[in-house]
Amino acid sequence: MQDNKIQNRTNPFFVPYNTPHDTVPFERIRLEDYEPAFMEGIRRDDEATDKIVNDPAEPTFENTIARVDPEKGEHYYDLLSRVSNVFSCMMSAETCDEMEEIAQKMSPILTKHANDITLNKKLFERIKFVHDHPNRELTPEEKMLLDTSYDGFVRSGALLDEEGKEKLRELTEEASMLTLQFSQNLLKENKAFTLHITDEAQLDGLPETAKAAAAHTAKEQEKEGWIFTLDYPSYSPFMTYSTQRELRKQMYMARNTVCTHDNEQNNLEICKRLVNLRRELAQLLGFETYADYVLRHRMASNTEHVYKLLNDLIEAYKPTAEKEVKEVEALAKKLEGKDFEMKPWDFGFYSHKLQMEKYNLDAEMLRPYFQLDKVIDGVFGLANKLYGITFKENKEIPVYHPDVKAYEVFDKDGSYLAVFYADFFPRKGKQGGAWMTEFQGQWIDHKGKNIRPHVSVVMNFTKPTEEKPALLTLGEVETFLHEFGHSLHGMFANTRFESLSGTNVWWDFVELPSQFMENYAIEKDFLRTFAFHYQTGEPLPDELIERIIKSRNFMAAYGCLRQVSFGLLDMAYYTQKKEFTADIIPYEKEAWKKAMILPLLKETCMTVQFSHIMAGGYAAGYYSYKWAEVLDADAFSVFKKNGIFDQKTAQSFRDNVLSKGGTEHPMTLYKRFRGQEPTIDALLERNEIKVQHKG
């Protein structure tokens, strides 16, 4: 006990942060603080569970479902969520070997702890009692919490016998370890590869920004020349602009064969095992497949609806996608000779040439107009136009890396709304891609105080150099808007319970706020607010904006089918009814072939790096990106009709969708905003897809 008291005095997780808005004191947290904080959080959770279970009073919503301490009136389970939020955020954005060791050690302990709660027979009996005999009329939010609590326990094995519960523990603990190993393997493989160029002639075709970034990377590694990596800001321009076909092939093969090699980072067997573990888990709980288990709590509701969406999209988009690819192939043959055979590492290069030929437009032409600082102003300004909120950088708020900026966010009435962190650039120990996360969620405490969220957007944009500020592509502007949309969902949260707050919604609804915001990237009136040349200050010319709008559907059908192919692959794995024994690489090619137009190489593999469905929560859920696209096109059509900055429409979207989190069924929330259920029509119209109706 003495050790614990010492820890209580020194471990920053155990004492009030005493920082602006109770933000995380990153500079005070050391690696050795995490494990004791996790263990103390688990101890406090166990103590809280015992209090609920042994409460002599009849189970009620307050003493059992809301998990309120009857003596102190406080909510239970605060410490563990506090340390877990920080640790998981750091594992993605600022990890190191020591953190990965902590994760390996804590992962099975935390999984066991979660199972100890959900498989606690006495606790479930109390929850079931309240579920079957509510002690009073419940609000819709309380009813949702009661239903999700009860169903969460059932879905976690509460109705199983002891043998079944033990089996469930084994399955979840193994899956937890394997997802962690999958992610660590992928990070190591991606960071291990570099293309080191010392002959300047091999940079032919590359834009200055790509060359400068590669020179900067080489300098950081104390090497001569230029270094290209598999991080998207380095990889993408190389594949788009490099005239060196063999080097493009080298980059493509490196990126598309990661975690398939004969080394410790091979993910093939891990993926196979994860598919089987999830199938076993679902069948243990009475479902035929893992997809059936997952879709029970999705807007799609069942596999038939998912396949209908994916197949409808294939039918609508495939003819146009085939034409798009043939156009690229025709241009390649025109430039290289009729015997030229296009390979996967050529597609980005020649499709870019086609884009230039058709629209005289490419990402690099726009980059000078998208200086990151100005884009930030534009995005914040958009939020102000729509919702009246303002952002103010506060250097007193601690950050975990010098690249990170922290802002206070204020509502239209001037009241404090949230803390917003932005982490823009790639670095060692940071996962690729882009995401939104939270260091603190939103809820209303026992005294009625509205605890406001601390949200973070993490991206990997091209870094500034000595000569140039950070300049974005239009695609990166879209990425920023996407993650910012998620953050608005978090920042506008206004619910009583944290587990129903912000982005804690059904998985095929969570992408609506993010994809909705992407629509603004090609809106003329939005671009005019921030797109100025970083050197001359000249605004983005109208004729360039017109070309952006005209080219917005360039390769849209091909892009749609690519996403659909990922959805098909996901469903193929998670609709397995028997043990999955196939070889991953050929199985993958078969699973998505009806949505594939370009031929693939037999040795490449997506599955082993498909974090979304293997380690990221999108298992049997990848279709939700396309599902949300139907929603976002439908929702944005209201803004197009009423005005893209219309505050009344924006307020309705905030009140009925963004602030409500998961407190009601998502379709109920959507219809309250839209007045009707969504249709696919707005998406087809946006992409200029004409469907031939049969009959």
Locations of the language-model features?
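Membrane-entry segments of alpha-helical transmembrane domains in multi-pass membrane proteins
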Residues: 26-38, 61-68, 263-267, 306-313, ...
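Active-site-proximal, well-structured secondary-structure segments within enzyme catalytic domains
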Residues: 141, 145-146, 177, 184, ...
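Short, hydrophobic/amphipathic alpha-helical patches that form generic packing surfaces
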Residues: 77-89, 147, 151, 253, ...
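Short pre-active-site segment immediately N-terminal to the catalytic Zn-binding motif
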Residues: 462-481
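C-terminal, non-catalytic "cap/extension" segments appended to globular domains
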Residues: 4-36, 40, 225-227, 374, ...
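Long, charged all-alpha helical bundle/coiled-coil segments in cytosolic proteins
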Residues: 55-134
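His/Asp/Glu-rich acidic catalytic environments and adjacent acidic regulatory segments
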Residues: 4-40, 44-45, 99-301, 402-405, ...
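Secondary-structure edge/capping motif, primarily at the C-terminal ends of alpha-helices
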Residues: 48-59, 83-94, 157-160, 258, ...
